[in-house]
Amino acid sequence: MRVVILGSGVVGVSTAWYLAQAGHDVTVIDRQPEPALETSAGNAGQISPGYAAPWAAPGIPLKAIKWMFQRHAPLAIRPDFTTAQLCWMWQMLLNCDARHYKTNKARMVRLAEYSRDCLQQLRRDTGIQYEGRQGGTLQLFRTEQQYDNATRDIAVLEEAGVPYQLLARHELASVEPALANIVGTLTGGLRLPHDETGDCQLFTRQLAAMAAEAGVTFKLGRNVRQLRVEGQSVTGVQCDDEMIVADAYVMACGSYSTGLLRQWFDIPVYPLKGYSLTIPLADDASAPVSTVLDETYKVAITRFDNRIRVGGMAEVVGFNTDLNPKRRETLEMVVRDLYPHCGPIEQATFWTGLRPMTPDGTPLVGRSPLKNLYLNTGHGTLGWTMACGSGKLLADILSDKSPEIEADDLSVSRYTR
């Protein structure tokens, strides 16, 4: 079957790989000249299934109000009063209760755990290299309340069979030695020993090269103008002056998927702006071993081979991609506090990207209201964590194979029931 994939980020390229492995004739289209030049370019680098959780959680509405008056708040909302933003925020608000949180987190962990398994199998099969580490991740708590609240997430981890370690303050340095001098300011941590890290952009480009060798065609530097639809089926993709025709189509354009589909149906995917710093590594002993997550500021600090990636923050500001210097100040503040000697922070590269977020945090993976159009978008802050699993799952659905995990609650139909 001829399949066209719109989007060459980590989700689109992963989907292309698995579809090619299933025997399909695959073409990937993207406006950028190379894969992984937008949201996949500078993310925090962690592959953290156990930490997969929706931003829509109990207490978030009140916290969001408080954060409006804090300099280093992890979430910032700039209302533009557009229908798209207001509807998305209202749907998110409806998911901010314990029942929805438990349901949403459980299915996010399910997909993320499956994705980690798919990544590990891919690594065994191909030997793909992307500065990956399998050292687990450590979530740091600065308050007793955060430590106590961890029990809510632990219950979901136990139900999903995810190994974990709840660490007291004095145990943190045994996992991350460079924290030894500042553990007195922390209350403890939650460690997930099976989590991983790696450079998402490097992975995507390596996988794209392997996909090309396997027969995938990449049409890069092509602007997708619109889908051509007749009846209930897509009949082509208009790219500049070329119409590209296939039997099936996959929408993996992240935050831009919503606009491309609006003429035919709505999907609740909205951009959540994030930031990162990439710092040259100066001292191994002063750097994290793997990934450390600061629960207070929602910032992740990840070790690559010769670099430190500091990523986080969330801004609801539409499609604005300006680099906000205040967000850089927050990222610098966190890394100076936890790892002050890891590298020359003043030499850091500052980056921003738009994560495609659904109100309930769970991506849209599966069929759409159009017969031959499939969705693989809305992964939010977890595109890297969920990419391989989402790609394999979508390939199975498109190929009419039984998915290896439950998939019905991952489709867009959950918003139309």
From Swiss-Prot:
Catalytic activity: a D-alpha-amino acid + A + H2O = a 2-oxocarboxylate + AH2 + NH4(+)
Pathway annotation: Amino-acid degradation; D-alanine degradation; NH(3) and pyruvate from D-alanine: step 1/1
Alphabetical keyword list: FAD, Flavoprotein, Oxidoreductase
Cofactor(s) this protein requires: FAD
Keyword Flavoprotein attributed: yes
Enzyme Commission code(s) on record: 1.4.99.-
BP GO terms, sorted: D-alanine catabolic process
GO cellular component annotations of the record: cytoplasm; plasma membrane
Domain of life of the source: Bacteria
UniProt entry tagged with the keyword Oxidoreductase: yes
Residues the entry annotates as binding FAD: 3-17
Alphabetized Pfam families for the sequence: DAO
Gene Ontology molecular function, alphabetical: D-amino-acid dehydrogenase activity
UniProt family annotation: Belongs to the DadA oxidoreductase family.
PANTHER family the record matches: D-AMINO ACID DEHYDROGENASE (PTHR13847:SF280), SARCOSINE DEHYDROGENASE-RELATED (PTHR13847)
Function according to Swiss-Prot or TrEMBL: Oxidative deamination of D-amino acids.
Protein name listed in UniProt: D-amino acid dehydrogenase
Organism of origin: Pectobacterium atrosepticum (strain SCRI 1043 / ATCC BAA-672)
Gene: dadA
